[in-house]
Regions:
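Acidic donor-binding loop at a coil-to-helix junction in glycosyltransferase catalytic cores
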Residues: 131
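Short, aromatic/basic amphipathic alpha-helical patches
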Residues: 82-95, 156-164
């Protein structure tokens, strides 16, 4: 993979957004995660949180765009937690600033996303829950390169989703495997 092929626009699903909030002190400030935290009991849990930390450190330097959608916010609203909503709105504000950096708002996207998203109505994506399908559709429409999730189930269909929709669906560890070798150049 060359530097120009590094996936730089990343859609955060609600599980990733929630993890960023829950472990923000570790991810953004280098704080500690206590030994009794439940992340240690989740297979690859700490590794994914550590990868999120590395990803966000690279992203701070402006080389990544982190995207959310109205459907993302709806999932946050459904949780009914004000602190989570406030966090999501902060992340949405960051995404809006990424979009504002384009002189012509339309240049941030392409018509290809509309055609690819239309494929989601076909039976071949029946394994997606309604919520996942909405978020994947949003990510494709927003021309995201990566759909980042903490879930284990959705990445099992990553090859099919990438082949059909041109989006990589992965956990943070997988994304860091792609991004890490180039991190110093993205600074």
């Amino acid at each position: 993979m060359s530097l120009g092929q590094i996936p730089g626009r990343v859609f955060l699903d609600s599980s990733t957004l929630q993890t960023l909030q829950n472990y923000g002190e570790f991810i953004y400030d280098g704080g500690e995660i206590t030994q009794d935290d439940r992340i240690w009991s989740i297979p690859d849990g700490f590794q994914n949180v550590g990868a999120l930390r590395e990803i966000m450190l690279v992203g701070r330097r402006g080389s990544l765009q982190v995207a959310l959608s109205h459907n993302s916010l709806q999932e946050v609203l459904d949780r009914g937690r004000c602190d989570y909503l406030q966090w999501a709105l902060e992340m949405l504000d960051y995404w809006d600033s990424c979009l504002a950096s384009y002189e012509d708002g339309g240049s941030a996207f392409s018509e290809q996303g509309v055609a690819l998203a239309a494929k989601l109505t076909k039976y071949q994506f029946g394994y997606l829950s309604e919520k996942d399908a909405r978020l994947i559709r949003d990510a494709v429409l927003l021309k995201c390169d990566v759909f980042l999730t903490m879930e284990k189930r959705l990445p099992k269909n990553a090859a099919h989703l990438e082949r059909e929709l041109k989006i990589k669906v992965m956990q943070p560890v997988g994304y860091w495997d792609l991004l890490g070798p180039w991190a110093a150049l993205l600074a």
